[in-house]
């Protein structure tokens, strides 16, 4: 796996790539999303098996992310032409069908290298997921091995949690969901949470 330049708490590596957006080719840059959160997820290859389940799941929940001021972008090392062919293939035949999220083409593998998810022996990306805040700062990184897909619910929960901490200055305990108790991050005030939950 490439080491990459992606670091928590630092500006996310910038990128520019051709994407398939609403069935057409469009140049997409990270800076296009300034002021919004971004969930950037990498997947190994088009026309495979776990990948369409993840892409369709993220596409089906795209509006939930947008309500939070967050956009979801998928990336693989395939070309925009392969992405389009896969989108134009019916879901019952292993295709994607129409999508509500862009798919970026990383044919040079630069994005995969910059984000540290390139599986160098095969030239494909591991299942990396990156949450970038509205200031362009990388807030979360997870990388799965190839055979296991990711949870859209968990990605959505993490965006909600980071946005909550940004706005309120409190911290979110394990398994936090909107409406749950948070912790005031100092020794005395944190006892309020711990006395209630232990």
UniProtKB/Swiss-Prot annotation:
<feature type="modified residue" description="Phosphothreonine">
    <location>
        <position position="182"/>
    </location>
</feature>
<dbReference type="GO" id="GO:0034599">
    <property type="term" value="P:cellular response to oxidative stress"/>
</dbReference>
<dbReference type="GO" id="GO:0070062">
    <property type="term" value="C:extracellular exosome"/>
</dbReference>
<dbReference type="InterPro" id="IPR019479">
    <property type="entry name" value="Peroxiredoxin_C"/>
</dbReference>
<keyword id="KW-0049">Antioxidant</keyword>
<keyword id="KW-0676">Redox-active center</keyword>
<feature type="domain" description="Thioredoxin">
    <location>
        <begin position="6"/>
        <end position="164"/>
    </location>
</feature>
<dbReference type="GO" id="GO:0006979">
    <property type="term" value="P:response to oxidative stress"/>
</dbReference>
<comment type="subunit">
    <text>Homodimer; disulfide-linked, upon oxidation. 5 homodimers assemble to form a ring-like decamer. Interacts with TIPIN.</text>
</comment>
<dbReference type="GO" id="GO:0005829">
    <property type="term" value="C:cytosol"/>
</dbReference>
<dbReference type="GO" id="GO:0097191">
    <property type="term" value="P:extrinsic apoptotic signaling pathway"/>
</dbReference>
<dbReference type="InterPro" id="IPR000866">
    <property type="entry name" value="AhpC/TSA"/>
</dbReference>
<dbReference type="GO" id="GO:0030194">
    <property type="term" value="P:positive regulation of blood coagulation"/>
</dbReference>
<keyword id="KW-0575">Peroxidase</keyword>
<dbReference type="Pfam" id="PF00578">
    <property type="entry name" value="AhpC-TSA"/>
</dbReference>
<dbReference type="GO" id="GO:0045581">
    <property type="term" value="P:negative regulation of T cell differentiation"/>
</dbReference>
<keyword id="KW-0560">Oxidoreductase</keyword>
<dbReference type="GO" id="GO:0042744">
    <property type="term" value="P:hydrogen peroxide catabolic process"/>
</dbReference>
<dbReference type="GO" id="GO:0008379">
    <property type="term" value="F:thioredoxin peroxidase activity"/>
</dbReference>
<dbReference type="GO" id="GO:0043066">
    <property type="term" value="P:negative regulation of apoptotic process"/>
</dbReference>
<dbReference type="GO" id="GO:0031665">
    <property type="term" value="P:negative regulation of lipopolysaccharide-mediated signaling pathway"/>
</dbReference>
<dbReference type="GO" id="GO:0042981">
    <property type="term" value="P:regulation of apoptotic process"/>
</dbReference>
<dbReference type="Pfam" id="PF10417">
    <property type="entry name" value="1-cysPrx_C"/>
</dbReference>
<dbReference type="GO" id="GO:0043029">
    <property type="term" value="P:T cell homeostasis"/>
</dbReference>
<dbReference type="GO" id="GO:0032496">
    <property type="term" value="P:response to lipopolysaccharide"/>
</dbReference>
<dbReference type="InterPro" id="IPR036249">
    <property type="entry name" value="Thioredoxin-like_sf"/>
</dbReference>
<dbReference type="GO" id="GO:0002536">
    <property type="term" value="P:respiratory burst involved in inflammatory response"/>
</dbReference>
<dbReference type="GO" id="GO:0048538">
    <property type="term" value="P:thymus development"/>
</dbReference>
<keyword id="KW-0597">Phosphoprotein</keyword>
<dbReference type="GO" id="GO:0043410">
    <property type="term" value="P:positive regulation of MAPK cascade"/>
</dbReference>
<dbReference type="GO" id="GO:0042098">
    <property type="term" value="P:T cell proliferation"/>
</dbReference>
<dbReference type="GO" id="GO:0045321">
    <property type="term" value="P:leukocyte activation"/>
</dbReference>
<keyword id="KW-1015">Disulfide bond</keyword>
<dbReference type="GO" id="GO:0045454">
    <property type="term" value="P:cell redox homeostasis"/>
</dbReference>
<dbReference type="InterPro" id="IPR024706">
    <property type="entry name" value="Peroxiredoxin_AhpC-typ"/>
</dbReference>
<dbReference type="GO" id="GO:0016209">
    <property type="term" value="F:antioxidant activity"/>
</dbReference>
<protein>
    <recommendedName>
        <fullName>Peroxiredoxin-2</fullName>
        <ecNumber>1.11.1.24</ecNumber>
    </recommendedName>
</protein>
<dbReference type="GO" id="GO:0005737">
    <property type="term" value="C:cytoplasm"/>
</dbReference>
<comment type="function">
    <text>Thiol-specific peroxidase that catalyzes the reduction of hydrogen peroxide and organic hydroperoxides to water and alcohols, respectively. Plays a role in cell protection against oxidative stress by detoxifying peroxides and as sensor of hydrogen peroxide-mediated signaling events. Might participate in the signaling cascades of growth factors and tumor necrosis factor-alpha by regulating the intracellular concentrations of H(2)O(2).</text>
</comment>
<dbReference type="GO" id="GO:0010310">
    <property type="term" value="P:regulation of hydrogen peroxide metabolic process"/>
</dbReference>
<dbReference type="GO" id="GO:0002357">
    <property type="term" value="P:defense response to tumor cell"/>
</dbReference>
<keyword id="KW-0963">Cytoplasm</keyword>
